Structure formats: structure tokens, C-alpha cells
């Protein structure tokens, strides 16, 4: 049966744009796959541990030679890796923080990337090979061509490259821009742009979830 892994990373709850669009996707996915499974992980509630040397060194040590510290470190990330390996579709909700991704999302990525396991030399044999990935992003401003901060987006390019390293090729980004417009008077002229962007993202999420 279809199995969706839904990962949220916004620190906000009710006011989060990325969460709201991801919820629309998840609800539409449930309607399209009534017998499907959704595994949900909220990185703001249960932040993954940042990498330490015990974890890194353990990945290059035979299991029977692991120290107690290494074994404990590996155990912390094993649940996250198992969730990725069990799913066949992914919904990642990733707001932009300081022009990049939340630190909890980066920590999650660092935990699930394991050379020789989730990332393999053969491009068609990694954890996300042949699987569908939808990434919902929310950005306080706009960073496209011709904007004052063109080139400042270190969020989407990073996520795209990481997913490619994990073997994903069926990737769609659903982005909402100018999320700060309703709360920052200096950006008030862009409220209509934000509302239009959010409506388009909601429609894109419903469509993507249903196919």
C-alpha cells in the first residue's frame, strides 16, 4: 500500500504557511489513497540530534567493533533512516530561515544520509530512487531573477541537490513567496502577491497529491 512520509520543520504552528500547504497536500493524498499510510514527523517537536564524531565514526566502523558511545549514537539516527526507507513517497515542509533551511531540517538530512546505505555509488540504487518527493517551501521575500535579492536563496538549491544525492528524480517544489508581507509594514504592497502565491501553492499541492 502507498506510504507517505510527511516531515514538518517550521517552528510556528497555526501561523505557519509551509505547514498549512503541507496539510492541504496530506489531506488530498489521504483522499486519493484511502488505504495508504502516513508517517508524520515534526522536527520542531522532536529535533534530531546534530552530528557528532561518535555518529560519523560509527558509520565507518564494523558493527561488532562499535564502542558503547558509537552504538548509542547510531541508535538515535536509526529511527529516522528507517522511516525514510519504509516510505515510497515524501512530503517535506521546509520554511526559509536566514536564507537557508531550518537547522532541524539540516540535522535530519545529516542523520539520514549514510554512504553505502541511503546514498550509493549507483545512481539508481539510493534511498529515494524511483520515489516521488514534494517539497513545500515558504519564503518571507522573493528571490527570483530581477528581484533585489536575486541569488540569496540557499534553501531550494540545497534541498534539490540533497534529494538528488539520495537518488530522487521526481521532485516538485511548491513555493509560497512574500510570507512576511502581511506582518511587515515595509512589505505591505506585496500582500496581494503573497495571497496569490499561497492560493497557487494550495492548488498545486492538491493536484500533486492526487496524481
From Swiss-Prot:
Q: Which UniProt keywords apply?
A: Flavoprotein, FMN, NAD, Oxidoreductase
Enzyme kind, highest EC tier: oxidoreductase
Classification via InterPro entries? Flavodoxin_fold, Flavoprotein-like_sf, FMN-dep_NADH:Q_OxRdtase_AzoR1, NADH:quinone_OxRdtase_FMN_depd
Residues given in the record as FMN binding sites: 10, 16-18
User: Pfam families attached here?
Assistant: Flavodoxin_2
Q: What is its EC number?
A: 1.6.5.-, 1.7.1.17
**Family of this protein:** Belongs to the azoreductase type 1 family.
Q: How does it assemble?
A: Homodimer.
Name of protein: FMN-dependent NADH:quinone oxidoreductase
Natural source organism: Frankia casuarinae (strain DSM 45818 / CECT 9043 / HFP020203 / CcI3)
